[in-house]
Structures are given as C-alpha cells and as structure tokens.
C-alpha cells in the first residue's frame, strides 16, 4: 500500500461574532487548512489544522504543497509513526512549532482517518 496523492485546501471561516483576547487580538475568522491523502487502493483520509485570523494558513498550505507532499508520495500510509518522524526530522530546522507542527498534525490526522476507513472503524478507535 502506498500514498498516491495529496491534495490541500485553504478556507477562511468567518466567526459568527468577533472574538478578542490579549494574545491574538481581534479574531474575525479562522484559516482552515485541509489535507486529503489518497492511497493506491482509492481510499482517502482527511486531516485538518487551523490558525486564527489571516496569518499562517497560506504558509501552512504552502509547506504542505511544496515540502511535505514530496516526502509523502510513495510512503506506506500504515506506517504513521515513521512518517511522523520523517516529517519532523525533515522540517525541524524551519520550526519545531508553529507552521511546521500545524502541517504535520494535519497529515497525522489524515493518516489516522485513512487507517480507520481501511479498517472500517471509527476514527476515535
């Protein structure tokens, strides 16, 4: 089994009311980044991450499309821990938190979702 394709999208989700706090300031929407990982058997897993406001979403999307996709293609989607380690080591020089962590977490969720679908189990199991 191999990862055949990765597709990503960026959505700006408006909040029903403006939120504010001392760390993030005014928040009118969230930037939601989705990752779809398809294996060579046609199954697809969906993962996501988000940032607050207009910063970070486009950068996370760019990292997924330009850096992470090439690292994932051809990998065994069942080997989730090894893929996590591979991504962490490949990206840790550009940041152990923030955008790199957001992107890796979206991939991780998509891989677990794909595994759950393959095993006909709910994701929480």
Predicted stretch roles:
Residues 38-118:
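Metal- or metallocofactor-binding catalytic centers and their adjacent structured scaffolds
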Residues 121-125:
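Short, intrinsically disordered, charge-balanced linker/junction segments flanking boundaries
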Residues 1-53:
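Structured beta-strand/loop patches that form or line metal/cofactor-binding pockets in enzymes
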């Amino acid at each position: 089994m191999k990862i055949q394709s990765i597709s990503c999208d960026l959505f700006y989700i408006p909040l029903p009311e403006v939120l504010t706090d001392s760390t993030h300031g005014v928040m009118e929407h969230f930037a939601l980044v989705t990752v779809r990982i398809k294996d060579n058997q046609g199954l697809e897993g969906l993962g996501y991450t988000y940032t607050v406001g207009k910063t970070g979403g486009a950068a996370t999307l760019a990292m997924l499309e330009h850096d992470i996709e090439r690292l994932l293609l051809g990998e065994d989607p069942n080997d989730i821990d090894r893929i996590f380690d591979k991504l962490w080591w490949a990206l840790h020089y550009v940041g152990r938190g923030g955008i790199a962590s957001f992107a890796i977490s979206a991939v991780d969720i998509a891989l677990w979702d794909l595994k759950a679908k393959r095993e006909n189990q709910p994701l929480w199991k």
